[in-house]
Regions:
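Conserved functional acidic sites
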Residues: 26-232
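Secretory targeting and sorting signals
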Residues: 2-25
Length: 232
């Protein structure tokens, strides 16, 4: 793993679960809010995104909605986001994600409860589920307050189950999706996990909207592009 990645991961690891204890050198733990206003990843109640694409050669539809609920994870108030993944027209995966924002504007990922479903709607797997403060899992950085090219972070800290990482590769990327074209306005990141060393994905974010596109770069065949967005 490159030095930049190690630095980013070490920084996140040092923070730990802010609701429980302060990091070394900090006067107090970070203050978190369920009101997520980071311009590249806003999560306000009522927001809704719909994506269309392909997964392993099959039609994909992904619907993401910010609920009006707030849940406390390790004492931290978190926004609750519902993510439903449809493949070939049927619900294949349903996930609840928890996010909170610190006072500087960085968005933290506090976990997820995911369910994979068979054609009859029965749960076949919950692998990848985790919650900060439970079984040694800790929150990670999902979107920094001021992303800079070269920054790397760990989004998840649940060894053996959830270990996503990402790096900022461009702040002026161009991206075109059914919802619109954004010339030189997109933040581009690349994601990977040591649990799947042969897989690498790219994501594009636009200020005021959030994620507009995701595509597998290697190790798979998945693409999702924003087709509609409701602010609230």
């Amino acid at each position: 793993m490159c030095r930049k990645v190690l630095v980013g991961i070490a920084t996140v690891a040092a923070v730990g679960l802010g609701a429980v204890a302060a990091a070394p050198g900090q006067a107090a733990p970070p203050r978190y809010s369920a009101k997520v206003t980071n311009p590249y990843f806003p999560l306000l109640p009522g927001m809704r995104w719909e994506y269309r694409g392909v997964k392993d050669g099959r039609p994909l539809r992904d619907v993401v909605e910010v609920t009006h609920r707030i849940e406390r994870i390790g004492g931290v108030p978190c926004a609750v986001v519902l993510d439903r993944n449809y493949v070939d027209g049927r619900l294949a995966e349903s996930t609840i994600d928890w996010y909170a924002q610190d006072g500087r504007g960085t968005v933290w990922y506090f976990g997820e409860a995911t369910k994979e479903l068979d054609r009859r709607g029965r749960v076949t797997s919950t692998e990848g589920s985790w919650r900060a403060g439970t079984d040694g899992a800790r929150q990670g950085v999902f979107m920094p307050a001021h992303p800079r090219v070269g920054q790397s972070f760990a989004q998840e800290h649940y060894p053996g189950h959830a270990e996503d990482r990402f790096a900022v590769v461009s702040r002026r990327a161009t991206v075109r999706v059914p919802f619109g074209a954004f010339r030189g306005r997109a933040l581009r990141t690349e994601e990977w996990t040591p649990l799947e060393p042969g897989v690498r994905d790219a994501k594009w974010y636009v200020e005021g909207i959030g994620e507009v596109k995701e595509a597998t770069l290697k190790g798979g065949d998945e693409r999702a592009e924003l087709v509609s967005f409701r602010r609230r």
